[in-house]
Amino acid sequence: MTNPWIVSLLLGATLVQANLYPPAVLNLGPEVIKKHLTQALENHDATAILQELPLLRGMQDKSGSIPILDSFVNTVLRYIIWMKVTSANILQLVVQPSTYDQELVVRIPLDMVAGLNTPLIKTIVEFQMSTEVQALIRVERSKNGPARLNLSDCSSNESTLRLSLLHKLSFVVNSLAKNVMNLLMPALPQIVKSHLCPVIQQAFDDMYEDFLRLTTAPIALSPGALEFDLLSPAIQDSNILFNLKAKLLDSQARVTNWFNGSATPLMETTPDRAPFSLTVRQDLVNAIVTTLIPQEELVILLRFVIPDVARQLQMDIKEINAEAANKLGPTQMLKIFTHSTPHIVLNEGGATAAQSVVLEVFPTNTDVRPFFSLGIEASYEAQFFIAENRLMLNFNNVSIERIKLMISDIKLFDPEVLKDTLTKILEYTLLPNENGKLRTGIPMSMPKALGYEKAMWSVSKGALKLTPASS
């Protein structure tokens, strides 16, 4: 029989080779796993199943293969009218790492009170039953499909079972209760396994499907949509990781861009102390920004929009060519061509955006040939934040890094003399236009679906990370 450690090691190696750097990683910590598995157990009425455990039949089945023990059981059972679990509670689950790779241990403590009715006494004899169910969550590969998480090896061990009489009664009744507990000790683990483990399996499968639905739900963009799909699951420490691929769709639901595994380093995906995190690779962030802010041409009648800057530009041009400055009319016009959409750079200190534009100055709106054309490389501060469950991005603080004179009909000049004026033009025209396209934000339902009302975005080298906000 193959050692499970070897299988896990080979599987883990396969996953690492196949998906070194996924476009996005959803990291679910033990807090989220416990919360959602507990809810799934409640949905399947796990405590009601415990209250229906067939204690008497379980003791009989356990002793049936041993004639002497079977005779003893029958003798004891003659003094019992009925016996059942009167109350049951599932205590706080524990999720912890396994000694094997790609495996988690889930411990489910149970606290039950059982009662039996005997003609030896008018009151019900009650005793406490405490035990624990243990199951393993593993990454397993199917012959017919990709790897998935599976729950296996669900069992209840006699070593975790504790039985005690709640109230001491007469010597005869106490002796009967002691004999019953002695018979339950070997029988109860199998009873729990037979009746509760299938429910735990169903609850886990439901939880897993809920996580996948949550992960793959389309995220609306304006225009189009972003969709994630599962590349591979993984287990690291006490956390479940979903390595995700992504695709961008246009307004007609046609795929415009695919993102799968990449040889480019993604980010640090080692689980941290956050209950969950969604980490998105920088190139996917940039593709989303490109969808929201396509390349375009802006036409601005400068004196109508920002008259102060129009006068400042006229004074700057006068220093270069006074005759040309006098030709600037009331309909003085600018054209700004966004040669590229803003390119986001994510680093530990924050996010910046770089963009190349071509700016042309026309004396009036009827002229077809500009005074001059400038190639401008600008950078902005990029701020990511959450507002009303939406991812928001805002650009501010324009800085011009480089200016190149491309065409000039007035005379050759050093474009650096226009830097201050050009900075104001971009600040008052291009940035508001692009921020306006970002104003609707991107809906993020994941935090709320995982049970967290508030979330926050943080920036690290090459990645954007969503985590619950500190309360």
UniProtKB/Swiss-Prot annotation:
The keyword Disulfide bond applies. One of its GO terms (cellular component) is extracellular space. Glycans are attached at N150, N157, N260, N397. Residues 1-18 form the signal peptide. SMART domains: BPI1 (SM00328). Keywords: Disulfide bond, Glycoprotein, Immunity, Innate immunity, Secreted, Signal. It holds the Pfam family LBP_BPI_CETP_C. InterPro entries: Bactericidal_perm-incr_a/b_dom, Bpifb1, Lipid-bd_serum_glycop_C, Lipid-bd_serum_glycop_N. GO terms for biological process: innate immune response in mucosa; negative regulation of toll-like receptor 4 signaling pathway. It is found in: Secreted. Disulfide bonds join C154-C197. It comes from the Eukaryota. GO terms for molecular function: lipid binding. Belongs to the BPI/LBP/Plunc superfamily. Plunc family. PANTHER family: BPI FOLD-CONTAINING FAMILY B MEMBER 1 (PTHR47395:SF1). May play a role in innate immunity in mouth, nose and lungs. Binds bacterial lipopolysaccharide (LPS) and modulates the cellular responses to LPS. This is BPI fold-containing family B member 1.
